[in-house]
Amino acid sequence: MRIIGIDPGLARVGYGIIEIENERKILLDCGVIETGKDKKEEDRLYEIFQDLNELINHWKPTVAAVEKFFFYRSSTTISVVQARGVIMMVLASKKIHVSEYSPAKIKLTIAGSGKASKKDILDAVMYNLDLDKPPKPDDSADALAIALTKLNEDGFN
């Protein structure tokens, strides 16, 4: 099983790809898709579309886990929702099953508390993937936490 975890955003889309091999979780790749603030929004969305397609074509994940988005009173809300729509469209076009998780569910599953801190999440990601140093940037660590939530749900603790 190979999973891609995705932390949606317009400026930065975090991603993390994990493979299960002999009941071990192996980190294959993690990082961010960054879009330039100087570009028009439609160009930024297209960049997410292209880069995510390339990632999926290269790594060929069989399932995906994406953070659910909750509406906040913020000027970036619509942009993030649009980026998330592009992400969901790419995954659907590749026939990849998607599981969605709220931030509280991710924190509870990974760190044992729905109110866990960023450091708690980072420590749990490092522990679960047997990493010596934290994944950078934070968006990629968040994406790995999202992927680990799905794996935990599927019984790969």
Curated annotation (Swiss-Prot):
It catalyses: Endonucleolytic cleavage at a junction such as a reciprocal single-stranded crossover between two homologous DNA duplexes (Holliday junction). Mg(2+) 2 binds at E67. InterPro entries: RNaseH-like_sf, RNaseH_sf, X-over_junc_endoDNase_RuvC. One of its GO terms (molecular function) is crossover junction DNA endonuclease activity. The active site is at D7, E67, D139. It comes from the Bacteria. Its EC number is 3.1.21.10. Binds 2 Mg(2+) ion per subunit. Mg(2+) 1 binds at D7, D139. It is found in: Cytoplasm. One of its GO terms (cellular component) is cytoplasm. Coiled coil: none annotated. It is an enzyme of class 3 (hydrolase). SUPFAM superfamilies: Ribonuclease H-like (SSF53098). GO terms for biological process: DNA recombination; DNA repair. Keywords: Cytoplasm, DNA damage, DNA recombination, DNA repair, DNA-binding, Endonuclease, Hydrolase, Magnesium, Metal-binding, Nuclease. Its cofactor is Mg(2+). PANTHER family: CROSSOVER JUNCTION ENDODEOXYRIBONUCLEASE RUVC (PTHR30194:SF3). Homodimer which binds Holliday junction (HJ) DNA. The HJ becomes 2-fold symmetrical on binding to RuvC with unstacked arms; it has a different conformation from HJ DNA in complex with RuvA. In the full resolvosome a probable DNA-RuvA(4)-RuvB(12)-RuvC(2) complex forms which resolves the HJ. Belongs to the RuvC family. The RuvA-RuvB-RuvC complex processes Holliday junction (HJ) DNA during genetic recombination and DNA repair. Endonuclease that resolves HJ intermediates. Cleaves cruciform DNA by making single-stranded nicks across the HJ at symmetrical positions within the homologous arms, yielding a 5'-phosphate and a 3'-hydroxyl group; requires a central core of homology in the junction. The consensus cleavage sequence is 5'-(A/T)TT(C/G)-3'. Cleavage occurs on the 3'-side of the TT dinucleotide at the point of strand exchange. This is Crossover junction endodeoxyribonuclease RuvC. It comes from Prochlorococcus marinus (strain AS9601).
